[in-house]
Each structure stands twice: as C-alpha cells, then as structure tokens.
C-alpha cells in the first residue's frame, strides 16, 4: 500500500516534489533496520539535499510539534527543559526557538544529521543514540517535555521506546508524538500495537492522555496525528 501510494505521488507530481517524496520514501522502506535508517539519513544530510527536500512546503511536522508545545506552555518557556527526539538537522529545534523555548537538547542516531543541527545553535546537549528499549545516558525525570516530530516510521522508533520516554520525563511533564497518521496501519511495528501500548500505559497509571488530534498536510499531502500525554 505505502509503495503504491509513493509511486502514484511520484508519477503525478512535478519533478522536484516527486524527487523529494522519493527521497523521503527511501528512508521508510519496508524491511529497513534502524542502522539502515541512520546511515541513510546521514548520507542524505551530507548530500545537502535533506533540508531542501523536506522544506516547509513539504514537511510541516516541526511546526505542528512546536505549536503543540506552545499551546501547553504559555509562560516561562525559556526554562522548560525539552528533549527533541529524532532531532535530525534541527528543524523542530528551530521552530521551538521561534516560540521562545531556550532549553532544548536533541537526540538522533545519525551523526551526519546532528552535525548540521549543531551549527544552528539552538540546542544545548546533542546525543547520538537510537531511541529504543536501551537505557539512554539520561537520568530519570530529566525533562519537562520530550517531543518527537518525524521520528516514527518503518525502521524508526519502536513501540517499546515509550517506556524510556516516560522514564526521562518528569512527573507532570509531557510526551508529545507527531507522526504520519497512516503509519498506524501501514507500519507493522505500529499496527494494532502502538495505540494499544499507549492505552496500557495509561491503564497502568504511567501517563494520561491529553489529546489525540489529526492534522492536514503533515508530510506532503499526508495527514499527521499528534498524541499528547501527561506523565504521572
């Protein structure tokens, strides 16, 4: 289904948009391991094409992520400690900075992406690690908010990583996940699993749902979904 949709988009859109969509699709191809994904992103960043391919006319995930945080933190944004998971080249960090957030760390497994993010001077600490079931070099209850925009997909962040997100977030803090809506059905890792685990964690008193919102044109013409949870 995802491959057919990608082919249809590529064939029916202008060459530049089709090329960008194709590059993004190759980062989410079925069967990719997390190591494959990290290597692809590093090469994409090194080519100088990543930020052009996923500019604001094509990819709005960072704007949606920053706005979701801005709606929750109306005051004293400079002191809100945030971890941008799957930070990439710093798109979300830049959008958060525009909203007045100043205490932002980033995490991404692709060093080529982080090399670009580092130059933007919107992050404090940058950590080159995969987000998985492995314990990160981050203490419990470190962040007021952890946020992901674009880090969910084939070979990307697994469901089990939700536990680690909760561990590093302070009680009362937020976990915000912004992703393509169709991945809930098209990505085997998430199909009949991700939202079930989210509900199980709520039933177990680990967090509580604040909102679940569908948004248009998250990535190219695809809808996005924003999950917002409060850690207990």
Question: Predicted segments — roles?
Answer:
Residues 134-146:
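A short acidic, Gly/Pro-enriched loop at the edge of an enzyme's catalytic core
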Residues 159-171:
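A short glycine-rich, Lys/Arg-flanked "PGG" loop and its adjoining helix->strand segment in the class I
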Residues 188-210:
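Conserved Class I S-adenosyl-L-methionine
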Residues 2-73:
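Conserved class I S-adenosyl-L-methionine
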Residues 216-232:
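Core SAM-dependent methyltransferase catalytic element
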Residues 172-180:
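Conserved beta-strand signature within the Rossmann-like core of class I S-adenosyl-L-methionine
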Residues 148-150, 178:
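Residues lining the SAM
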Residues 83-135:
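Class I SAM-dependent methyltransferase SAM/SAH-binding core
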């Amino acid at each position: 289904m995802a491959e057919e949709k990608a082919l249809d988009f590529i064939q029916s859109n202008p060459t530049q948009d089709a090329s960008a969509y194709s590059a993004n699709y190759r980062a989410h191809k079925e069967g990719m391991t997390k190591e494959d994904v990290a290597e692809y992103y590093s090469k994409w960043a090194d080519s100088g094409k990543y930020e052009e391919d996923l500019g604001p006319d094509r990819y709005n995930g960072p704007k949606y992520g920053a706005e979701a945080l801005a709606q929750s933190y109306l005051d004293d944004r400079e002191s809100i400690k945030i971890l941008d998971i799957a930070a990439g080249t710093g798109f979300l960090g830049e959008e958060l900075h525009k909203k007045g957030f100043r205490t932002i760390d980033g995490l991404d497994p692709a060093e080529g992406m982080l090399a670009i993010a580092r130059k933007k001077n919107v992050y404090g600490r940058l950590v080159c690690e995969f987000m998985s079931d492995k314990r990160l070099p981050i203490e419990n209850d470190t962040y007021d908010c952890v946020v992901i925009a674009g880090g969910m997909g084939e070979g990307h962040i697994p469901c089990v990583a939700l536990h680690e997100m909760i561990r590093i977030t302070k009680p009362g803090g937020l976990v915000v996940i912004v992703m393509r809506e169709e991945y809930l059905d098209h990505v085997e890792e998430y199909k009949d699993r991700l939202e079930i685990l989210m509900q199980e964690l709520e039933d177990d008193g680990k967090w509580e749902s604040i909102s679940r919102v569908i948004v248009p044109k998250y990535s190219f013409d695809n809808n996005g979904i924003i999950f917002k949870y409060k850690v207990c």
